[in-house]
Regions:
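Perimembrane helix-loop junctions in membrane proteins
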Residues: 107, 204-207
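Alpha-helix termini
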Residues: 34-36, 185, 206
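ATP-dependent adenylation/nucleotidyltransferase module used to activate substrates
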Residues: 1-172
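Local cysteine-cluster metal-coordination motifs and their immediate loop/turn environment
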Residues: 96, 177-203
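Short cysteine/histidine-rich metal-coordination sites, predominantly Zn2+-binding motifs
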Residues: 209-219
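Short amphipathic alpha-helical interaction/hinge segments
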Residues: 146, 206-209
Length: 219
């Protein structure tokens, strides 16, 4: 979604889709849709492999434990369930890598890149490394660690999932080519339908008033 927004709304011409493989259970599906996104936007695709992050992680994303079935009435307080899926300092690690890549590209090709990340408004139950404050702090840090001032931008950070879906509709995004599932299914285009992320995806479409085209293994 963010890549489409950057290309088609912000009118950036040259994009690199940077995909991170850190041993997450949905790596196959995420890679598939990231490559599809890169192809659709005529962007480069680059994969960064970070095996050590899996060793550090306490997240269910890096395990084979079955995801808990989340019901609609449980969405009022998802803090405990969210914590189970949180990968400690993941976004800091990802952005550090992205900064190193952007700095290297400038040194090599004299091409200056901005870094865009797909944070959204998480409300009260936010991850500590997915906030406006975090973006502000890491932008302050990059002024010290890079020579050319590579700005990090989260263009949709003040939008909730419902608003983002509406923006996606205006951008004519094929939502069947987006992926949210934490649990993963046997085929790339199927979401489990019961994990926290799938439930939030369903709610986003419901409140946006836009038909959800997603194929769920469990309704």
């Amino acid at each position: 979604m963010t890549a489409h927004y950057v290309k088609n709304r912000l009118k950036y011409k040259k994009l690199i889709i940077l995909f991170f493989n850190y041993g997450q259970r949905t790596v196959k599906q995420e890679r598939y849709f990231s490559k599809k996104c890169a192809k659709n936007l005529n962007a480069e695709f680059e994969e960064a492999i970070l095996p050590e992050l899996k060793k550090l992680s306490t997240s269910l994303l890096n395990s084979n434990v079955k995801a808990k079935t989340i019901k609609r009435n449980q969405l009022k307080n998802t803090s405990k369930e969210s914590l189970k899926w949180y990968v400690p300092c993941r976004n800091l690690i990802f952005l550090s890598y992205a900064l190193a890549l952007a700095e290297s590209l400038y040194i090599k090709n004299k091409e200056k890149y901005g870094i865009f990340i797909g944070f959204k408004n998480e409300g009260k139950e936010f991850y500590p490394d997915a906030t406006s404050k975090f973006i502000e702090q890491i932008n302050n840090l990059q002024k010290t660690v890079t020579n050319k001032g590579i700005k990090i931008i989260a263009p949709l950070i003040n939008k909730d999932k419902e608003e983002i879906i509406k923006i996606g509709k205006k951008l004519d995004i094929n939502f069947n080519e987006t992926y949210s599932c934490y649990s993963g299914a046997k085929t790339n285009n199927i979401h489990c339908g019961y994990c926290l992320s799938c439930r939030l995806r369903k709610e986003g479409f419901y409140w946006s008033g836009i038909k959800d085209p997603t194929i769920y293994a469990k309704k």
